[in-house]
From Swiss-Prot:
It comes from the Archaea. This is A-type ATP synthase subunit B. It is found in: Cell membrane. It is a peripheral membrane protein. GO terms for biological process: proton motive force-driven plasma membrane ATP synthesis. Its main location: membrane. Component of the A-type ATP synthase that produces ATP from ADP in the presence of a proton gradient across the membrane. The B chain is a regulatory subunit. It comes from Ignicoccus hospitalis (strain KIN4/I / DSM 18386 / JCM 14125). The lineage of its organism: Archaea, Thermoproteota, Thermoprotei, Desulfurococcales, Desulfurococcaceae. Keywords: ATP synthesis, Cell membrane, Hydrogen ion transport, Ion transport, Membrane, Transport. One of its GO terms (cellular component) is plasma membrane. InterPro entries: ATP-synt_VA_C, ATPase_a/bsu_AS, ATPase_F1/V1/A1_a/bsu_N, ATPase_F1/V1/A1_a/bsu_nucl-bd, P-loop_NTPase, V-ATPase_su_B/beta.
Amino acid sequence: MAVPSVKGKEYESVSEIRGQLLVVEGVSDAGYGELVDIEMPSGEKRRGIVLETGKGLAVVQVFEGTTGISPAGTKVRFTGRILEMGVSEDMLGRIMNALGEPIDGGAPIKAVEKRNVWGEPINPYAREYPDEFIETGISAIDGMNSLVRGQKLPIFSGSGLPHNKLAAQIARQATVRGEEESFAVVFAAVGIQYDELLFFKKAFEETGAISRTAMFVSLANEPAMMKIVTPRAALTLAEYLAFQKDMHVLVIITDMTNYCEALREISASREEVPSRQGYPGYMYTDLATIYERAGRVKGSKGSITQMPILTMPNDDITHPIPDLTGYITEGQIVLSRDLHNKGIYPPINVLMSLSRLMRDGIGKGKTREDHPDVANQLFAAYSRAVELRGLAAIVGEESLSEVDRKYLRFGEAFEQKFLKQDYYERRTIEQTLDLAWEVLSILPEEELTKIRPEYIKKYHPKYRVKAASQK
């Protein structure tokens, strides 16, 4: 990325400070993405990165912000290096800033090697197709929107919804069955409030999940560039753990909306022509450089699975951030404000959610043979129950047929028993599927048209009770 032709060359020609940007005059050979050392007249040092060059000018984004910097007497030295971060397995169990520096009061981290933070998306030709189930312990995800190793599956949330709570639960519970020892979580918190940091720290430490988790944090009051770097630093460590140490790594990024706001802030500082709702026209490409670093690589045992979380402004799923994210990723988990208001946690709207790779990661030999059929039946039955609720609100429940009233009972049981679960409750996939059969048994057997007859005879509670009584 960087052009090292001005390596070590120092300038005192800062002509303008624009937001968090420095404009340096008289620079001819600076490289895009090149690291810059900045020294103020007081001796205080800061770091920056070249965002733009041309016409003898270099535009530098300052990591720590420009507060206190004066054009007069400020020295800018171009290093000829790109932004790198030291990586090590010792980073598991630690809390770090966007640059991989410990902020938990612990000992310094001894790096095994240094890696380019900007990284590269995985070459499509080198990709291995994702087809191994990841158990999150959450029925609405495992049963109906299954996560597959190497997938990128975002969570679309809204302001005030419990996405942080859900993220902490997934980070604590998720595992690849039979591969528990080689499973790690890399958690990137982008632009969060300090109380949110304390929540995540407490959630991981209380349950012991911190031992297999590396946290990268940029707070809301930190400069935009720190928020831009945070998910990339997390993915840099994830790539090392996955493809050098053969680990299965789940990367959770919250909140990508904060990331996009930082991207818009930097774009505005550079006076770029805005696109939809003021976001830069290259936001799609920029998001792809993050999301496409997830996956499996041929010849490697490890993998990177991504669950980015974003809050939809005004709950608008057509907003540019969720809209562009949906084009790049392989489905979405959508949280519902209506379910949240009914006291259901996690408030996952399964009808609006989708996992495009689910079919390849479930079924016989992966989860259980009846899983695909049961998921289809749950979708069909719950969809009809929701439709009948609207009809009952108009004509009254007593005007519905007996079968329709059973669908209403199913819908209520589905939400209260299947969707709803405790924050500390971890369900295996077998428990999830058995629970699905329990709520489906409310419906007449002839209504279970999506499930093969042999599975009904084997797994339906009615036949299980008969089989148990005959033993």
